[in-house]
Amino acid sequence: MQRPSLSTSVNQHYLNKLMNLTEVMDVAASEDIVDVRGMKLVAKGARLTRAQQETLGGHKLKKTLESSLSAVGGADNGLILATARRILDTSVPINRILGRNAGRGISPQTLLANMHFGHAMRMMLTLTDRDGPEALEHSVTVSLLAIGMAKKLQLSNDEQMAAGLAGMLHDIGELYIDPAYLAPGKRLLPHEWAHLVVHPRIGQMLVTELEAYPASVARAVSEHHERLDGTGYPRQSAGGMISGPGLAVSVAEMLAGVLNKDYPLERAELALKIIPGEHPHHFLSAISGALRAQPANRPIALPRPDENDDVAITRLWWRIADSLESGQQMLRDDIERSPRVWALIQRTLARIRNIERAFISTGLDAYLKNNHGLHEHDDGTLQFEKAVATREITWRLRDIARDLALNTADVPTDRAMLAGLIGLLDGGASEAAALQLRAQPPSLPQAQARAA
């Protein structure tokens, strides 16, 4: 299969971010920028301005624009190390996670200091930094954690460096995506994920074509949303198909999303274990060890019990049960379907059953009982676990909806056949209509038997 490559047509989203950068920082051509007909558009050394946006965006170039630019005073190792020091000075959870593996090989700070970034990657990191301090901080956090996880896997120093570089650059593909799909608080519909799931592949192409890194770096960038059980994206790779550095970056990216919240290690531990097989057990033990290392009597302020949350848990249970029934009914119906759709439904049902087991194993099923009394003596611990488990399970149902939508996007009949199931899993209008028909939650015995 031919490897996709970067286009010499300029991506408009990248170009717009670049033009915004020219208004606050000197961005210059490191060589002549020439179109495919040989016309010089920007001379070597010339400073880019907003006035050149239309010219650059309207021509197909002889070389990619990314390889022909440099920024004066952009992101570099000094900024990265300063950001890393700030993270390590303020984040107790990250220190505890890294501290569990501190004696294995080169320190994360030394690896960060030894990273090389050419003009193109420095530009990517500079644009990332311009998205706000949290954006670069996220990249550095993922890099630090990826190195820590690579140490947990006992990877070589070179593989630890690959994991760290991939962690630093894992989201550069998002620079090429319409910002509307990345807006804070934006809830993507299942079919809209098509705009986002490509960013690991874009990142892989950028790293491959713009830097002389080992191939393991680009590969790990492409794998940072994959999961060990094959439920990730973009390739749904599983098991040994995912590289060691890729596994390290994958779990690091997930951890970075919860470590800035309250009770971060508790959240991380539950997220890692809620669906067995999503991540290597090594990573769960690393988080559990960091959690055990916390002071036993540390001050806590857990959330107050809220009986209104029981309604949300009941709705979530209905959603799981109705999704299972919908998929099973499709297999029973005497309608024509392709082998691909049949396999897709079977795979979906297996994933929903795993989520059903997670619902029960986390104890959420106890809240379905009338007068369960769980709130009476709760100091907030149960409330916290309930909230985290509900969130994690909801996200995984939406993951399945996303995968169904993307796998049927090119076949209208398949998409129409699965539209109702996709809506149930995503929590959309189809779910709301189904739930209005319910007076009592589905019974638990069969599900509990399946989970046993």
Where are these regions (language model features)?
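PP2C/PPM family metal-dependent serine/threonine protein phosphatase catalytic domain
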Residues: 217-235
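Divalent-cation-assisted or electrostatically stabilized phosphate/pyrophosphate-binding catalytic cores
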Residues: 184-205, 230-304
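Terminal helices and disordered tails flanking the catalytic cores of nucleotide-processing hydrolases
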Residues: 1-109, 115, 264-452
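Amphipathic alpha-helix face/heptad-repeat signature
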Residues: 135-139, 165, 192, 199, ...
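Acidic/His-rich, divalent-metal-binding segments that scaffold phosphate/diphosphate chemistry
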Residues: 66-216, 236, 299-303, 307, ...
